[in-house]
Amino acid sequence: MKQNFFKPLLSAAAVAAALSGCTMIPKYEQPQVAVSETFKYDNAQNSIQAASLGWQDYFADPRLHRLIEIALERNTDLRTAALNAEALREQYRITRANLFPTLAANGNGARQRTAADLAGGRAAITESYSVGLGVSAYELDLFGKARSNNRAALESYFNSTAARDAVHLTIVASVAKAYFNERYAEEAMKLAQNVLKTREQTYRLSQLKHKAGVISAVDLRQQEALIASAQADYETAVKNRVQARNALSVLINQPLPDDLPAGLPLSRQFKVSRLPAGLTSDVLLNRPDIRAAEHSLKQANANIGAARAAFFPSITLTGSVGSASNELNNLFKSGNGTWAFAPSINVPIFTWGALKASLDAAKIRQQIQVVNYEAAVQSAFRDVADALVAREQLEKAHAAKAKQSKAYADQLRLIQLRYKHGVSSALDLLDAERSSYAADSALLASSLTRLENMADLYKALGGGLKRFGNDTGDAAK
């Protein structure tokens, strides 16, 4: 009897296996987006790419390294994104389990006394026992509905991991830029202190000249105003440093540790002085937001397959095999075997357009994801192109500001000597001090802008997922 039972099961399994190759998922074609094949202002000749460059290979400051490490461990946005990815991974495992039949074992035992009036005048005690294995309501995936849903769940998980990576890149770049602002405020404080000290020295000399009648009280008041201006600039830099540290504390989700390594000056923040874009726009595929958009498109593609499969019959199998007896000792004796096989089929006939509407909606959602993918690529291309052209202009502007700062510093030094010897006037000295300080401040601000641009370009090119270039896993691990 058991042999006769297994034959139809094996035949059904063979047919199901033969039909399981059928799938309704449309063939995936990556959308072609109209962007330039190469980036303007990218003249780098080496083959290094940002995505293959670890953030410790890019940023040079050990203090910044430590802050990034803490942020990747404790930042709430990244932890939320990572937990979302884990939840979707488990959801994918649940969906994948639907591809296979669920096998359950069961055992039952009962002992019952029947009243005498119901048992022909004499009370009777009856027993029954059974054990078995069964498959309950397993739907054969003949037209790929389960596999389409499984593929959609997998792409949803991949999308969540890409979203996590995007948050990762944002944190690395945000911590770097906040740290650069803190370094900038620190150096602006030192510059204001040096200028304040120089102006106080000049003021003391001017006081002597005023007593000697060489300069007027007006000249003295002008120098006092410059001293007050330098003091105000110093206090502004102190405020900016505190605010930058507050921003860093939010990013790392804790107060700044007291044992951080000493920081490097703004001029020594990078190990790589010039980051090439990679010559072609294909480098955009390294960006997590592009990967996330593509996985969303593939998920929508798989949903079309599930909607198509809903038009076809669904076959559900329920079956069991086991043994039963009215005596426990005879439960596994020959002849006490049992089996049951109950297939069912559901054929959609009249759905009043619901299935057609469901398929049309799936196709529309797929087209929406195509548009979203194209928009993501266009936005990514613009991010890189803007960062590259900004880098080109910022480098030229920075070089010009450096020359300007040096020229004004030389001029100030000469006028200070001339002022001491009574050749230059107090007005000449005031103008030279203002010009030199303004040039130094502009050069410092230019340094900050260049550093922020380098951090933005690194992120725009998909860099920052790895700690070191030879890492195979995420930098957060």
Explain the meaning of each model-derived region.
Residues 216-218, 423-445:
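Short terminal targeting/anchoring segments
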Residues 70-79, 89-101, 133-152, 162-169, ...:
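A glycine-/polar-enriched beta->alpha junction
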Residues 2-14, 19-73, 154, 238-285, ...:
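Terminal intrinsically disordered/low-complexity segments used for targeting and assembly
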Residues 3, 23, 146, 162-279, ...:
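Periplasmic alpha-helical coiled-coil/stalk elements that build and connect Gram-negative outer-membrane
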Residues 210-214, 419-423, 460-464:
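A short glycine-centered flexible hinge/capping loop motif at secondary-structure junctions
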Residues 43-46, 50-59, 108-135, 258-276, ...:
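Small/polar, glycine/serine/threonine/aspartate-rich low-complexity segments that form flexible
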Residues 64-66, 128-130, 177, 222, ...:
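Transmembrane beta-barrel architecture of outer-membrane proteins
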